[in-house]
């Protein structure tokens, strides 16, 4: 499964390289395929852990392959996708130099995402928390970026400023200290067979009604904001406690 993840991520990079920044139909179709390949790779990545635990074939080698696959699919592939979609023509001319004649600003910006993904995965490999992730998981960040060409093909293209802002925001969240819950640890104790069937039926109905990509996109966005909301609530609580200790020490001592 890890190799399937890596393979489809590599396919996405190759497909992205055959398109060019612009709004023509052919390029949009190529970018759509590149985004869908990232989603297929995410399916392999999602099945990898449960299958390994079910079959009892977990190993250090598998963990390393999983990290390399995630870096390819959710780090390099989204960076290549956004570069080809928006940044390949973003250059700063250099009149004072013979070689090169321009500064490839687009290349530098697109490299931010794989750099942050690599750091995020390396940090995950050396610091384990059974209940939560520190920083946005790279598969979620990569999936979010993969939806940009999907929404652009089915609806309206995402303007360059918004696409870049989202691209950089996802990269920053990966290396942030924002904590995200592990769905398998949080939801598993509350799921029964009946609830699982009901949930699957609801998801299937929503996919039929709204379109599969909007349902998955909503789940991804909901997960991203869940960590941010918890982070800001915790931050406000710390500020309030610090305020009480500094400006109302007497009240706290009398309680």
Predicted regions located by residue number:
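Topogenic membrane-insertion module of multi-pass membrane proteins
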Residues: 1-46, 219, 223, 230-234, ...
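Active-site His/Glu-centered metal-binding helix of metallohydrolases
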Residues: 7, 43, 47, 51, ...
């Amino acid at each position: 499964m890890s190799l399937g993840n890596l393979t489809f991520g590599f396919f996405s990079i190759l497909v992205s390289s055959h398109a060019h920044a612009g709004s023509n139909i052919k390029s949009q179709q190529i970018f759509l395929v590149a985004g869908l390949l990232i989603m297929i790779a995410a399916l392999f990545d999602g099945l990898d852990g449960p299958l390994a635990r079910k079959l009892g074939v977990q190993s250090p080698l598998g963990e390393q392959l999983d990290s390399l696959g995630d870096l390819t699919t959710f780090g390099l592939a989204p960076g290549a996708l956004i570069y080809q979609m928006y940044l390949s023509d973003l250059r700063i001319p250099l009149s004072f130099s013979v070689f090169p004649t321009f500064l490839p600003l687009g290349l530098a910006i697109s490299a931010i995402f794989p750099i942050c993904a690599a750091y995020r995965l390396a940090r995950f490999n050396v610091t384990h928390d059974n209940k939560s992730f520190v920083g946005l998981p790279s598969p979620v960040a990569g999936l979010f970026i993969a939806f940009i060409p999907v929404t652009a093909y089915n609806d309206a293209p995402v303007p360059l400023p918004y696409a870049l802002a989202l691209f950089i925001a996802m990269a920053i969240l990966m290396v942030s200290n924002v904590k995200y819950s592990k769905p398998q640890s949080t939801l598993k104790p509350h799921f029964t067979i009946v609830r699982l069937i009901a949930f699957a039926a609801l998801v299937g109905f929503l996919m039929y009604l709204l379109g599969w990509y909007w349902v998955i996109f909503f789940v991804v966005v909901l997960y991203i904001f869940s960590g941010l909301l918890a982070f800001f609530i915790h931050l406000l609580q710390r500020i309030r406690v610090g305020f009480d200790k500094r400006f109302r020490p007497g009240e706290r001592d009398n309680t």
